[in-house]
């Protein structure tokens, strides 16, 4: 299913390089722009969505009847497209790509948007909000995540002076998928 020779997949991996480059990370900086798991907002936060669910009680939404039920503001099986996710780097990049009418196919956009939604694709949360056609989207994200951030081999650290060598190739990929020139950010 995930063909390494499919060029748009390479752009999905390229998108994640910002997380690799945060060695000098400043905790006072804009961490939301670099990494972090995401979850659905507008409904009860399931315990499997966060590392320390005992802190969910500190969230005002936990006490708001509009948001503190299993479905919250959503209809059962409304589908992924109807859900709002916590804002982060994934959602930002997804919206930027859509705003620029990228030619990256739906599968690639789903990978970018949902790959940090670990409660959904890794822990089985939100199935009650999925449409049947969302199952294939789940398969794509799960397949991609086998090769993503947390599974990288530290022995294959590609940081260094590769930019000049790789720039022409990736610039060509960006142009192929409608991301050359000026972009709407």
Spans of model-derived segments:
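Divalent metal-dependent catalytic cores for phosphoryl transfer on phosphate-bearing substrates
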Residues: 1-164
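C-terminal helix/juxtamembrane-tail motif
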Residues: 167-185
């Amino acid at each position: 299913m995930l063909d390494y020779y499919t060029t748009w997949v390479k752009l999905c991996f390229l998108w994640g390089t910002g997380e690799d480059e945060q060695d000098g990370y400043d905790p006072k900086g804009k961490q939301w722009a670099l990494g972090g798991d995401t979850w659905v907002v507008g409904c009860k936060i399931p315990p499997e969505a966060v590392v320390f669910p005992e802190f969910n009680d500190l969230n005002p939404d936990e006490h708001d009847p509009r948001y503190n039920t299993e479905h919250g503001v959503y209809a059962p099986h409304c589908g992924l497209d109807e859900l709002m996710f916590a804002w982060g780097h994934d959602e930002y990049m997804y919206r930027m790509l859509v705003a620029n009418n990228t030619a990256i196919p739906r599968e690639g956009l789903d990978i970018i948007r949902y790959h940090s939604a670990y409660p959904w694709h890794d822990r089985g949360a939100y199935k009650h909000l999925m449409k049947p056609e969302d199952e294939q989207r789940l398969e794509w994200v799960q397949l991609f995540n086998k090769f993503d951030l947390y599974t990288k081999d530290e022995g294959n650290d590609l940081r260094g002076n590769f930019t000049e060598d790789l720039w022409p190739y990736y610039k060509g990929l960006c142009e192929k998928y409608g991301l050359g020139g000026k972009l709407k950010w």
